[in-house]
């Protein structure tokens, strides 16, 4: 018993010592001040890609905020007009890429404006933490400069935000991202190499980045095939930093598509399943069937989320008969409930097919070319929904949780292909991350963690070139 008692005593002693010693934080000013002030020709411009919900959406015809502000006058999806603004249109037999509406992305959502009832005038922090990190490295933000928020005295911009319509197909964003990459390179002064950019991408933005690196501006073909994997986008990127990206999906996306969501109870309106179900990108955040993250509660067998008949059988999302009222709001010019349901099921099928196509494109094993460094920042200290069981009536229950950031599991961020199969030593992933940093923060807290700031500044300012 003596060795056991001694071991327990030692552990208690170490624990007490740890409790009595406040954690030290690195003096980032002392570490990076010199590098930040010496803006040489070898510094790459940086692009910031937000995740789902991370871009402000507006209606230019009415000047109304569609997403990014819950002030009075903003689109309210609880009303018929507001629901039509927030949702994407649905048209029978028309490819998703050809379906357009009046809503446009404006800027990255650095803060979220709230002006409702008791919360009048409150601003909720969103992507401001990434911008603060880059500001600490003396990066000059184009959006802040052009808006007049900061006067850079005519100096060239070195930081560029990538606002995009996060409702639409993820692969569709690659073309606009490529245009911004070329804009950022062209903005650099004479004498600069103008060859590479660095990109920091949060959450779903990392999936946009992963697709762009592999396929450049080429969208997914309409016939369901895959484009040539030529790493065209990687030619323009030196450092790709993914933060909390659900590369293998998240069961929470299914929950939202089935049940709808209120993003901040008492603050925001309710987004009904049919409104969210009109958005192809949310389906692209679903977990893979082969990973068995969604199972039949009675048999334990994986549920095929990419088969439209599954959604009809369980009455999920756009296939839910109880969504008839919302569909009437979304499709006011379609006279009958039967026609509206047919259009909704057609849209559902197209979204599921596009999601499966995107997954094949980014899951394909491939080695990145020399000159590209991919890094991952992920959380693994919070119990995160990992497996959902489907009851016979189609309702969902979280069957198990796993380490993550409370939104994205550790294994999803890693794109660990061992999930759902027998144990194998070492992570098996097509993502090829050179560096991985695990933090104890939650999903949005990752970008305000001092270790994140330290890691990003080192990577962008001091890390030796390949």
Residue spans of the language-model regions?
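Bacterial N-terminal signal peptides
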Residues: 7-17
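Generic detector of short alpha-helix boundary/capping microenvironments
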Residues: 7-8, 228, 365
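C-terminal subdomain of alpha/beta-hydrolase-fold enzymes, centered on the catalytic histidine
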Residues: 317, 322-466
């Amino acid at each position: 018993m003596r060795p056991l008692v001694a071991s327990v005593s030692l552990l208690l002693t170490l624990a007490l010592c740890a409790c009595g010693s406040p954690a030290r934080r690195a003096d980032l000013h002392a570490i990076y001040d010199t590098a930040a002030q010496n803006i040489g020709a070898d510094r790459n411009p940086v692009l910031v890609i937000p995740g789902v919900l991370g871009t402000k959406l507006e209606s230019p015809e009415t000047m109304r905020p569609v997403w990014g502000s819950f002030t009075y006058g903003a689109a309210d999806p609880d009303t018929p007009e507001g629901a039509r603004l927030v949702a994407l249109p649905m048209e029978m037999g028309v490819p998703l890429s050809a379906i357009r509406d009046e809503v446009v992305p404006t800027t990255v959502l650095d803060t979220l404006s709230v002006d409702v009832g008791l919360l009048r005038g409150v601003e909720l922090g969103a992507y401001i933490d990434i911008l603060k990190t880059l500001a600490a490295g003396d990066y000059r933000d184009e959006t802040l400069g052009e808006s007049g928020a900061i006067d850079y005295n005519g100096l060239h911009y070195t930081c560029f935000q990538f606002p995009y319509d996060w409702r639409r197909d993820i692969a569709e964003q690659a073309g606009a991202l490529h245009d911004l990459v070329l804009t950022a390179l062209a903005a650099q002064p004479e004498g600069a190499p103008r060859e590479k950019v660095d990109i920091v991408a949060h959450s779903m933005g990392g999936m946009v980045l992963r697709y762009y690196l592999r396929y450049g501006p080429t969208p997914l073909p309409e016939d369901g095939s895959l484009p040539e994997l030529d790493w065209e986008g990687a030619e323009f990127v030196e450092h790709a930093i993914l933060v909390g990206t659900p590369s293998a999906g998240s069961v929470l996306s299914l929950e939202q598509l089935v049940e709808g969501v209120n993003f901040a109870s008492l603050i925001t309106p309710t987004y009904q399943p049919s409104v969210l179900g009109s958005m192809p990108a949310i389906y692209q955040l679903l977990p893979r069937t082969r990973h068995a993250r969604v199972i039949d509660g009675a048999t334990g067998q994986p549920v095929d989320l990419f088969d439209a008949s599954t959604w009809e059988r369980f009455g999920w999302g756009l296939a839910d008969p109880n969504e008839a009222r919302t569909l009437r709001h979304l499709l006011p010019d379609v006279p009958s409930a039967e026609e509206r349901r047919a259009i909704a099921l057609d849209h559902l099928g197209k979204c599921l097919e596009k999601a499966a196509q995107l997954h094949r494109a980014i899951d394909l094993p491939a080695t990145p070319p020399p000159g590209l460094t991919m890094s991952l920042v992920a959380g693994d200290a919070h119990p995160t929904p990992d497996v959902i069981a489907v009851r016979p009536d189609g309702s969902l229950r979280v069957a198990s949780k796993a380490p993550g950031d409370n939104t994205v599991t550790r294994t999803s961020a890693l794109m660990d292909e061992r999930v759902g199969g027998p144990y194998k030593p070492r992570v098996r992933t097509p993502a090829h991350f050179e560096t991985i940093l695990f933090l104890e923060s939650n999903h949005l807290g990752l970008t305000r963690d001092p270790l994140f700031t330290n890691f990003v500044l080192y990577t962008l300012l001091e890390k030796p070139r390949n």
